[in-house]
């Protein structure tokens, strides 16, 4: 089954019931049903930047075209003659001059920012605040299924304690959870640190072909995406692992944030235990306090 969306003037629509064996005419009929644009005047584009597909052969199969699960098809109505193959925005000239940029997509700081961010990039830029509970449960299931790999030495608590802990909505995700999600999605997850301006690449040696990026300021995670400024073209959140340009652009964004002091030094920031009101300094003291007392609800002072 192909998981596709189409974007037209009347909004973005989920396209269901199509597979790689579906023919072009089935695709066009589905688009007409969702957008109201007649089959014979549809201009269908895919990719980033988007380029037009030659879909004149209605009996051809979708597997013969560069259409893959997760894609968003851009659909316009052709008025007279065919337009240039790359025309995602209305410009004064015939050439496409807009340069894609990498940006941070801010998500809420609600203890579940890691899970929200990973879901956002893996779903192609779909924000779903309700996903965190499901992802926490998924991680707990994976950990519980392999107590040897996920031992107390790895988790910092027993396997059973960890599974109970990660399901709570007041706990934070970190490197362990990113590693688990990388394996689950079969995707390299790159975390760009704004304090050190480095990239931690989870799944780097696993041979994955896909890459997604998060930015991390010492406490909070946000997803990174590539967008065309001033355009309605959907953001790109999944990249090839051979695309090192995107890593360089992400590091530039992190360096800019560092110069603006947009990070939290987790070794020196002031915290307070919200259970017993004990004052603490830095991540190390917070972890030790949690280990001694079982308290895990901290607030920044």
From Swiss-Prot:
Localisation: Cytoplasm
In UniProt terms, what function does this protein have? Hydrolase that can remove conjugated ubiquitin from proteins and participates in endoplasmic reticulum-associated degradation (ERAD) for misfolded lumenal proteins. May act by triming the ubiquitin chain on the associated substrate to facilitate their threading through the VCP/p97 pore. Ubiquitin moieties on substrates may present a steric impediment to the threading process when the substrate is transferred to the VCP pore and threaded through VCP's axial channel. Mediates deubiquitination of 'Lys-27'-, 'Lys-29'- and 'Lys-33'-linked polyubiquitin chains.
- GO CC aspect terms: cytoplasm
Renumbered to this chain, region (His-loop) spans 216-220
Keywords annotated in UniProt: Cytoplasm, Hydrolase, Metal-binding, Protease, Thiol protease, Ubl conjugation pathway, Unfolded protein response, Zinc, Zinc-finger
Q: Where is the OTU domain?
A: 102-227
Record keywords: Protease included?
yes
Listed name of the protein: Ubiquitin thioesterase OTU1
State the residue spans of region: Cys-loop.
107-113
Where is the segment annotated Variable-loop? 166-176
Q: What class of enzyme is it?
A: hydrolase
Q: Where is this region: UBX-like?
A: 5-83
Catalytic residues in the record: 110, 113, 220, 295
This protein's record includes keyword Zinc: yes
Q: Which InterPro entries match?
A: OTU1_Ubl, OTU_dom, Papain-like_cys_pep_sf, Ubiquitin-like_dom, Ubiquitin-like_domsf
Q: Which residues bind substrate?
A: 219
- Pfam families for the chain: OTU (PF02338), OTU1_UBXL (PF21403), zf-C2H2_OTU1_C (PF24560)
Q: Which Gene3D superfamilies match?
A: 3.90.70.80, Phosphatidylinositol 3-kinase Catalytic Subunit, Chain A, domain 1
The C2H2-type zinc-finger regions cover 271-295
Q: Which domain of life is it from?
A: Eukaryota
One GO BP on record is: protein K27-linked deubiquitination
